[in-house]
Design a protein with these regions (language model features):
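FIC/Doc superfamily catalytic core
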Residues: 1-380
Length: 380
């Protein structure tokens, strides 16, 4: 059973846009379109990319049992001592950098090539081994140690399957399937090819995000899909393997997998919409409080600083506001006095926490079934 799956050439021969898939597809596409519009209400796109990519990085890494805390991640951003950052946090931060790098490579020409995928994996794992084969890549059942699937062990097959996948991703004439259905197929195919020695899962989930960008379903890499996968981890791995176990007679299993991904897109997009609305409300609140306090010294860079850096420090404020260090320190102290930041001393360093913004992300699980008025109660 471990080796019988024959990775298919794409496109698949099945009619995968069944009635059930089309119904769920409509819901998912509507939510994505709404998210795309809501994201444009945040004036500085880098705030959303930075904040949401970090959450995606943390949850995608958690799928692989690489666990860190939000506090560790934010503290790493203000620490001058790289040596004290724990290994899990470093891995998550590398993942975020991989999202950034991948996004910059695809946003202009809208091509998600194998070279881009290699660069993403290189950033995730800090190596440039490229596509390879290895018996150690066999996937095992974590409970009993059985080998449940062995990816291709012939490098020519890996290269051929990745070339076919690259065409399927980028050649719109190769398949007229809806992009979200294609994304589900792409993700499964990549997981089965397993082209790298390590980092396949995380790289594959970044490919999902970048695919939404190259197909113009989103302008920014902000769909927070890994949280859904983390919450449904057992089902995620079960459905991936179910397609392999049925081998060629697996149209039903493909439909179930596609429905799972589409439901994830709908749920995740809905949650992210509410989160973006919460950030927008909070930014407006801070602006209303700080404008009269700073008067003529107020600049939009002030708000950008507080939301781009949930944990900020004097050097960041000095750089963003283009002021002297002493002035930057005074600015931060004023914001603390206004109740919008909390000052924390660690060793010889001071950093300043945007507590309301951090609370918004800490309460993110609660946003799943709540409306904007509830978000307002969380951020106040």
């Amino acid at each position: 059973m471990a080796n019988k799956y024959k990775i298919p050439q794409l496109p698949l021969s099945y009619d995968l846009e069944t009635i059930a898939v089309l119904k769920q597809l409509n819901k998912a596409n509507k939510k994505l379109a709404e998210l795309k519009g809501v994201a444009r209400t945040i004036p500085n796109e880098n705030i959303l990319i930075s904040m949401l990519a970090l959450q995606e990085a943390r949850d995608s890494s958690a799928v692989e049992n690489i666990v860190t805390t939000q506090d560790d991640l934010y503290q790493a951003g203000v620490s001058d001592n790289v040596r004290i950052i724990n290994p899990a946090t470093k891995e998550v931060l590398r993942y975020r950098e991989a999202i950034f790098e991948g996004f910059e490579m695809v946003r202009k020409n809208k091509i998600l090539s194998n070279n881009v995928i290699r660069k993403v994996q290189e950033k995730v794992k800090q190596n440039n081994a490229g596509f390879l084969v290895s018996p150690s890549k066999a996937l095992v059942n974590q409970t009993d140690g059985r080998v449940i699937y062995t990816p291709p062990q012939d490098i020519d097959e890996v290269n051929e399957k990745m070339s076919n996948l690259e065409r399927f991703i980028n050649d719109q004439e190769m398949s007229n399937l809806d992009p979200l259905v294609k994304m589900a197929i792409i993700h499964h195919q990549f997981e089965s090819i397993h082209p790298f020695g390590d980092g396949n899962g995380r790289t594959g989930r970044i490919v999902n995000i970048l695919y939404l960008v190259i197909t113009d379903l989103l302008d920014l890499p902000i769909l927070y899909l890994s949280r859904y996968i983390t919450h449904h981890k057992g089902e995620y791995y079960y459905l991936i393997q179910a397609i392999r176990d049925k081998n060629t007679d697996n149209a039903k299993e493909w439909e179930e997998w596609i429905l799972f991904i589409l439901k994830g897109v709908e749920e995740t997009a809905g949650n992210t919409i509410e989160l973006v609305k919460g950030i927008s409300l909070l930014m407006a609140e801070y602006k209303n409080v700080l404008r009269p306090i700073f008067d003529k010294a107020y600049k939009h860079e002030l708000i950008n600083n507080l939301f781009f850096h949930p944990y900020t420090k004097i050097e960041y404020m000095q750089h963003d506001m283009m002021v002297q260090r002493k002035t930057a320190a005074k600015y931060l102290d004023r914001i603390v006095e206004a109740g919008l930041l909390e000052k924390v001393k660690k060793g010889r360093e001071n950093y300043y926490i945007n507590v309301k913004l951090c609370n918004l992300f800490l309460h993110y699980n609660e946003l799943s079934e709540q409306k904007t008025d509830t978000i307002e109660s969380i951020i106040k």
